Amino acid sequence: MVTKTLTAPDNKTATRLLNVAETLFSEHGYAMTTVRDISAKSKVNQALINYHFKNKRGLFNAVFERRATVLLKERADLLRAAKIKAKKKPIPLKELIYAFVYPPLRMASEDKGGQSFVKLQARLHNEPKEIESALRAKLYDKVSLLFVDELKRTLPKLSESSICWRLIFIMGLYLYVASNTGRLEVISKGKAKGGNLKQALPEILNFCEQGFLSAPTQP
């Protein structure tokens, strides 16, 4: 008798499901995307979604974790490299900002899937609280807190509250820019290109650096 084993989630069928689900979730959100929608667009039987991911929430989590783990590893690696380079001194502010914003901007600029994931990140706060909170706690908190600690060393005159506020502003900024809505092209009359990483990165770094260097506003 042949025993059927569960196929690994990185096989062709599961990867196709992840790619299609990523696009649909980023465009319509968790609640408005159905298993039937994903099945129809991917041309994969609904039973195989349950086979690989158990249910819609399991698929959503897998979609999110697939790229988030890559992004966060890159972010942590850049931070680690900056710490080594600093030789126990505070890390230069612009290098901290670069380590934080470059991975998602790079990901969004390289392929359509990366851009879909950044859009998915941007709309995570609109998803059911139990899904949003669980994903943020599992995936993002550890690395984000590492950056808070390093920013406190680099900016000792800023309160932790101000540092966290300003870091949140940076998150909103890069998520909007990386989503490449086309708004930048409209208001600049085509002079600026939102999808151009070489153009966007220095603007973001300079803007965020000045934001962190502005006078403390909270005790």
What function would you assign to each model-found segment?
Residues 94-99, 111-138, 181-186:
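Amphipathic alpha-helical segments used for helix-helix packing
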Residues 16, 24, 28-58, 62-66:
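Helix-turn-helix
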Residues 77-114:
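Hydrophobic alpha-helical connector segments
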Residues 18, 94-101, 198-209:
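Short, amphipathic alpha-helical "lid/cap" segments that border enzyme active or binding sites
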Residues 11-19, 53-80, 136:
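An amphipathic alpha-helix adjacent to DNA-recognition modules
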Residues 100-104, 118-125, 170, 174, ...:
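Short alpha-helical scaffolding segments that buttress acidic/His motifs in well-ordered protein cores
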Residues 2, 138-219:
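C-terminal peripheral helix-coil segments that are non-catalytic and often amphipathic
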